[in-house]
């Protein structure tokens, strides 16, 4: 059996976390910014519509296009409330921003026509559209910015649900991780590490030794192997292994001839790199690697981390795991940008380190 068949990862079960977009008023009540801004918008809209009706009912001339601006603003307010209740604000941010920008133009145009007109009733209507223009400008700043922007983070910090996850940061994070993925097969790493530790590396001068191109995920070389499991590299890997086997055997034979005292040691080293990987030592190492996420003991998860934001695992990566905000995770390796972790339900895999925070004691779990 070749090594490529032994390191093929077992597919992970689909994530159990599903996003609920059912109608819930608590989604609206849990956001202070939504309640305060929409409430002010409703009050301003009532002032504008009241002043407009009073002004139009008299003999005073009233700009007719203002009626459409007031109706359009009402549709925007109702749409915002529905987006919050269905928890779809992040899905329609571009639509919300552009729609509010149009309403801002309508209201500022109406304010220009009403401010310089005569009559107290028109003054009330102009005050309403001016307030709506100010609120629309604040909405454009908030909904037009990413959730990772300083203003949005400060506003969302008052929300009961906490800071919203940033789609932009998430996309950049995954793109950076894909770009830094190691292109060296796991088999090469096993051989390179063993040759370097056994002292044979100096005997093969001129023979190219590929090295891992990154250590972004975890400190162990086992995880680097999981990032490259394409079957189209198996032929090149087998050719490399056979060539390396011949070189190691040659070096081992030369070592036996020159120094009989090291005969047993060199024989063990040569047998370790069997082409079919039938040796017990190598089999044990691969078994430990395959059990990296499934059979790891409780003692290895010596850290605890609290999730700062919710995270949805990438469907293309079988070793990412999803988690909820404020969820407590057990972590076994805290080096690099990706940590090995386990959820309370036993699901194990890797998590982005910038989405969690290490905690020291039980008192920090409830903060």
Curated annotation (Swiss-Prot):
Residues with Phosphoserine modification: 166
GO biological process: regulation of actin filament polymerization
Pfam family of the protein (one): SH3_1
InterPro entries: SH3-like_dom_sf (IPR036028), SH3_domain (IPR001452), Sho1_SH3 (IPR035522)
Residue ranges, Cytoplasmic side: 1-32, 87-93, 144-367
PROSITE patterns: SH3 (PS50002)
Bilayer disposition of the protein: Multi-pass membrane protein
Keyword Transferase carried by entry: no
Domain of life, source organism: Eukaryota
Location relative to the cell: Cell membrane; Bud; Bud neck; Cell projection
Keywords assigned: Cell membrane, Cell projection, Glycoprotein, Membrane, Phosphoprotein, SH3 domain, Stress response, Transmembrane, Transmembrane helix
Glycosylation: residue positions: 59
Region annotation (Disordered) ranges: 252-276
Family matches, as SMART domains: SH3 (SM00326)
Transmembrane region(s): 33-53, 66-86, 94-114, 123-143
Stretches assigned to the SH3 domain: 300-361
Keyword Cytoplasm: no
GO CC terms: cell projection; cellular bud neck; plasma membrane
Subunit-structure text: Forms homooligomers. Interacts (via the SH3 domain) with PBS2. Interacts with FUS1, STE11, STE50 and RNA polymerase II.
Summary of the function given for this chain in its UniProt record: Plasma membrane osmosensor that activates the high osmolarity glycerol (HOG) MAPK signaling pathway in response to high osmolarity. Detects changes in external osmolarity and activates PBS2 through the stimulation of STE11 and targets PBS2 to the plasma membrane. PBS2 activation leads to changes in glycerol production that helps to balance the intracellular and external osmotic pressures. Activates also HOG1 in response to heat stress and mediates resistance to oxidative stress. Involved in the regulation of the mating pathway. May be a receptor that feeds into the pseudohyphal growth pathway.
Family: Belongs to the SHO1 family.
The protein's name in its UniProt record: High osmolarity signaling protein SHO1
Gene of this entry: SHO1
